[in-house]
Amino acid sequence: MNELHRFFGMRNVLAVAALAAGLAPQVLKADNAQCLLRNAIMSGAYVASGTGTVVGVGPIAVVGELIYNGDGTGNAVLVTQSVNGATSTLTNIPVTFTVNSDCTGSKTVGTGHYNFVITPDGSLITWIVTDNGVTLMGTGVRLRK
């Protein structure tokens, strides 16, 4: 009886593993199609913050409010940054962005370039600067639509 129980137990494990392996591509396809609204998902007022390093200069920290219009454009209303202890505030910086159907994207804020991942409901953006010499990453959280 013990051998029979072990055989059926192993057979069930193998069946579940085969089912999971067969369904995995479908799950990935579903995940890749979560941002079908594309640019429209990135809409409203967001608070963004991040930390990192400017190579050869020192640490950097930023916080700001950005408005995304849902059409690939926006505006950084107010951004305060501290670079190696020197603080400055910038206002009204133009923003352009593209959201892909797999919820990845890219944006330009002024002269800075970023890659990001956005949640399917548009409530959270995780971003990283892609410009050479800057290691800076952070998040953006939607405050209101």
Segment roles from a protein language model:
Residues 3, 22-24:
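Post-cleavage N-terminal segment of exported redox proteins
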Residues 27-145:
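Mature soluble binding/inhibitory domains
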Residues 2-15:
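Bacterial N-terminal signal peptides that target proteins for export
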Residues 15-22:
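Bacterial N-terminal signal peptides
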Residues 7, 26-27:
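A subset of signal/propeptide-processing and intrinsically disordered low-complexity segments
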